[in-house]
From Swiss-Prot:
Residues 326-356, 369-380, 387-404, 412-433, 630-642, 811-869, 886-899 have a biased composition (Low complexity). Zn(2+) 2 binds at C926, C929, C956, C959. This is Lateral signaling target protein 2 homolog. It comes from the Eukaryota. Transmembrane segments: none annotated. PROSITE patterns: ZF_FYVE (PS50178).
Length: 984
């Protein structure tokens, strides 16, 4: 008897309830599995392949329906699956559940994943538990299908007092937990899953992208409209700008190249070498150059900058710095916290007792007075000899050597990002720093001084420093198609290794041979190099940086200590002020930027520092000072100082290798764009997730949201196979739909609500207020006292123009002011009628793009909101009523603008029956309210004379009832009102 009842309760094929759908899907799966077990798959491989494909499809269907049942029964008791955030995007597919079930059955049967034998052995017990639990759930669900199924029910109707229902509930909970554990284990074994650190780094990358976008919007590189419209160009612009911002602006963020490589995000880890080179060059750009580069990365426009090559500070120098370098330096020094404690520029005006101070004073005076004396130094034969000492100097002539000026950093973003690589040099005219009086120094004392300061430790440190430089800078760049990014950062005529290493290496072998020529080879850069090195040592304040850890140590510290004895407090307070002004972090090399003039950093080599130092040393003080230096030498501290100075020289030297600023910016553009565009290929899924989050966070909030009820969960996988009759029924009135499509352009429709309209229509109109456009309405022969609704059912249709007027405000203001000239309007009636006719002819031909006349048309460029749209429409109608000549002989006619259509993307369901739209269930717009309905809810048709639609068009059922039932009564009332208005 029970079997007979079960047979009677078996779900029908057309039953759309969840239990019925599960019943038929499970039966199909069982049939395929039985057929697959009935023959030898090795004998018939083609048939086996087809059946396996059908098996996996049926498994997907069964698990999808089971998932819907668990959603309804378990609800919040389901096992969390937050781990899916660590999965690659391509793994999260619709058939993931079927793949997991198939893999669990294979593992339970004894097979193993290829090249994953260890993981397969560990997962096998879990896979067996999953298959067993799923089999139990299938049996219980089949039993419920035969006992408690309600045909075509959208919800489950289970007997809560039945023990099998409670058993089903517990079985579903166990299966859900086991299946979630197996999903994490199986996917982790098959693909690379992000660790916790990698996932957090990806989130930080998203924060960087968002901050970059907000910064680009703030400085005008991008527009908010592009973000709101999801402009595809932003998919390329944002990653490019993020690289620049992450390396320069937010230097301590996720693109901090100083952190270990394993802590860097996996997205940028392959590009670490090239990013370091890009960072070093970016830090030498000023504000103007950085803005030009970012604009180039956004728009791909030509570089439009004429900044000379010498401008290499992160902040653009002010005109005062360029025109008056000495004056600006003195002002910067005097405006500090202690006016009497400054660098050697201000020291020359207060201290002149010692020989060192006299030498510095002569150098500064010579720089101030000899801006145009470059011809002498360019013809000096000793300059050529000094230039040949380093290959890095071959590309520059003394006439092109700019002097450095202090470039204070007003913006905290660049001051944080700036390091010693941003050794400043501005566009000041070159100065001749040579002084004939200094050539009287004794060369023999210099040679003896050099030989006494050499040591074996210095040789070892020099070799190690050279190895570190070669290892850091000679690494190959990350490849893009047909391009080496590492080589792109080098000039075409200079090899990669010559950029940073050649000057030090070649100088090592040539300095001893030219030791006696140190005082004779003075040029602008060498004298400036002495001051730069001396000030650098003063600012760093190393306790024992007396000895230079190079192969040819110099007496820079001797000069420094000689200057420090009378002004030790001055230097200390100056160094403190420098750190407070620029907010530098713990790196020592950060404390000597943007404060004092440096020579051309390309020429500030070891030999240059040696020669310049010896110029300022009094011969009588060399021997005691040198003994004091040797007594307090610290090799490690001096080595750290040498690394910092070398880093600054290397970075600025790399910039000076390029022919022009345009060439440098172009190289940076190619490299940055190459790295950013490769992210689109190598990390497409991660980049899509980041950009999606960035767009959602930074898009402007919608002005008005359409209230559409949420869809029910049980109908997410609703299967609907439309028959021929269904298709015909749902597309009923196809001719009307074609007519509607020809008659109305939804993009140009306006939200319009007449004063006498009902509230329901106004609500539908307000739902599409965001689609409002500037429409103009022509009203002819309108009575002065007639209401806007009094002409809605007139027989004649006035012309409706949809135009984007450029003078909407002027037309609206003139229409408002026309009330004061009513009598003049009456006298000029004939002239106005002629203007109306001409305006209509132009609108019929090409459309009106000019401001409409106040007497004929009125624009609707009000605020984009439903309230202002409706109130503005009333004002426009009233203004037009006042401007028209009252006449009892003419009939009233007014045509309203059709309502805006709700976009298809904002209406996933029918607004009447809430049925989701599918490939067969089409969307239809009601011409009266603009709503989106299915074919069943919008199969009515009626003419809409108030919109100028005399033919029957598609309307929804609610609008059809209102229009048909109230049409005659409203028309009669309107006629009475029109007669009364004309009589008055």
């Amino acid at each position: 008897m029970d079997t007979f009842k079960r047979w009677l309760n078996k779900p029908k094929a057309d039953d759309k309830s969840l239990l019925a759908r599960f019943f038929h899907a499970d039966r199909s799966l069982t049939a395929v599995a039985s057929e697959l077990d009935s023959f030898d798959g090795r004998a018939e491989p083609d048939r086996c392949t087809r059946l396996v494909s059908r098996l996996r499809q049926n498994q997907d269907k069964v698990l999808a329906i089971t998932n819907l049942i668990m959603e309804e029964l378990l609800g919040e008791d389901r096992d969390p699956r937050a781990f899916r955030a660590k999965f690659p995007e391509e793994v999260l597919q619709e058939n993931l559940a079927g793949q997991l079930w198939f893999g669990a059955e294979c593992l339970a049967a004894g097979s193993s994943i290829m090249n994953r034998e260890t993981e397969s052995k560990e997962m096998r017990p879990l896979a067996q538990a999953v298959t067993k639990s799923l089999g139990n759930v299938r049996v219980l669900l089949r039993d419920q299908c035969l006992k408690n199924n309600v045909p075509n029910s959208k919800t489950l109707h289970l007997d809560l007092n039945d023990s099998t229902t409670e058993q089903l509930y517990e079985s579903l909970k166990i299966f859900d937990r086991l299946f979630a554990e197996f999903e994490l284990s199986y996917v982790s074994a098959m693909v690379q899953v992000k660790s916790r650190h990698e996932y957090e780094m990806q989130q930080w990358i998203g924060v960087l992208f968002s901050e970059t976008l907000q910064r680009a919007l703030k400085i005008g590189l991008l527009d908010q409209e592009m973000v709101d419209a999801f402009d595809p160009g932003l998919m390329f612009s944002i990653p490019r700008l993020a690289i620049v911002a992450g390396l320069v602006v937010y230097a301590k963020g996720p693109l901090n190249m100083d952190m270990p490589g394993d802590q860097l995000s996996e997205m940028f880890r392959p590009f670490r070498t090239i990013l370091i080179k890009i960072r070093d060059l970016l830090r030498n750009l000023n504000n103007q150059e950085l803005y030009q580069l970012e604009k180039l990365l956004c728009t791909n426009e030509d570089i439009n900058t004429k900044v000379p090559l010498g401008s290499s500070s992160i902040e653009a120098p002010s005109p005062e710095h360029s025109a008056h370098p000495t004056t600006s330096s003195s002002q910067n020094n005097n405006n500090s916290s202690n006016n009497n404690h400054s660098s050697s520029s201000s020291t020359t005006t207060t201290m002149g007792t010692t020989s060192t101070h006299r030498t510095v004073e002569r150098l500064v005076d010579q720089r101030n007075n000899n801006h145009n004396s470059n011809s002498n130094s360019s013809t000096n034969p000793t300059v050529e000899g000094a230039t040949l000492r380093s290959p890095s100097m071959l590309s520059l002539s003394p006439t092109s050597t700019p002097t450095a000026s202090p470039a204070p950093s007003p913006t905290p973003s660049h001051s944080i990002a700036s390091t010693s690589s941003a050794a400043t040099s501005s566009t000041n005219p070159p100065a001749d720093w040579s002084d004939g009086d200094d050539e009287d120094e004794d060369d023999d004392d210099i040679e003896v001084d050099e030989e006494d300061l050499e040591s074996s430790d210095d040789d070892t440190d020099e070799e190690q420093l050279l190895k570190d430089i070669v290892a850091a800078d000679c690494a190959s760049g990350y490849l893009i198609p047909n391009t080496n990014l590492g080589n792109l950062l080098q000039p075409q005529e200079v090899p990669l290794t010559d950029n940073f290493v050649a000057s030090e290496d070649d100088e090592y072998g040539t300095t001893e041979q030219q030791g006696h020529q140190g005082l004779e080879e003075e040029e602008p850069s060498t004298s400036a190099a002495m001051l730069a090195a001396t000030r650098t040592l003063q600012r760093l304040r190393l306790p024992s940086s007396d000895t230079e850890p190079l192969a040819e140590p110099t007496t820079i510290k001797a000069t420094e200590e000689h200057m420090q004895q009378p002004s030790g407090r001055h230097r200390e307070s100056h160094s403190h002020r420098h750190h407070q002004r620029h907010h530098h972090h713990h790196h020592h090399r950060h404390s000597h930027q943007h404060q004092h003039r440096q020579p051309h950093p390309h020429r500030t080599t070891r030999s240059g520092r040696k020669r310049c130092s010896l110029e300022a040393v009094d011969p009588e003080t060399i021997q005691p000072e040198r003994e004091q230096n040797l007594a307090s030498g610290d090799t490690s501290a001096a080595s750290s100082l040498s690394d910092d100075v070398s880093l600054a020289m290397r970075n600025t030297t790399a910039r000076l290798k390029f022919k022009s600023t345009e060439n440098l910016l172009h190289r940076l553009f190619v490299c940055i764009a190459g790295v950013a565009d490769q992210l689109q290929t190598n990390f497409a899924s991660d980049l899509r997730q980041i950009l999606r989050s960035v767009f959602l966070m930074n898009m402007s909030s919608a002005q008005e949201e359409i209230d559409i009820p949420e869809k029910t969960k049980e109908s997410e996988l609703f299967e609907f196979r439309a028959s021929e009759n269904d298709v015909i029924q749902e597309s009923a009135g196809s001719n009307q739909s074609i007519y509607s499509a020809e008659e109305v352009n939804p993009e140009l429709d306006n939200v319009f609500s007449a004063g006498g309209g009902n509230q329901a229509t106004g609500q539908r109109h307000s739902a599409g207020a965001s689609m409002q456009r500037n429409n103009t309405i022509d009203l002819a022969n309108q009575p002065g006292e007639g209401s806007p609704s009094g002409a809605t059912m007139a027989t004649s249709r006035s012309h409706v123009t949809r135009s984007r007027s450029l003078g909407d405000q002027e037309a609206a203001s003139s229409a408002t002011s026309s009330t004061a000239h009513l009598r003049q309007q009456e006298q000029q009636q004939q002239h106005q009628q002629l203007q109306i006719q001409l305006q209509r002819q132009r609108n019929n031909s090409v459309g009106s793009n000019t401001p409409s006349s106040a007497s004929s048309t009125s624009s609707s460029s009000e605020q984009n909101s439903p309230v202002s749209a409706r109130s503005g429409s009333r004002r426009r109608l009233q203004s037009n009523n006042e401007t028209q000549m009252p006449s009892s002989a003419t009939s009233t006619s007014a045509t309203l603008s059709p309502p805006a259509w709700i976009p298809d993307g904002k209406a996933p369901r029918c607004m009447a029956c809430q049925t989701p739209f599918t490939a067969f269930r089409r969307r239809h717009h009601c011409r009266n309210c603009g709503g989106v309905f299915c074919g069943v809810c919008s199969n009515a048709s009626a003419p809409l004379p108030k919109y100028g639609l005399t033919k029957a068009v598609r309307v929804c059922r609610d609008c059809y009832v209102r229009e048909v039932r109230s049409g005659m009564g409203v028309q009669g009332v309107q006629r009475v009102q029109s007669v009364q208005a004309s009589a008055s």
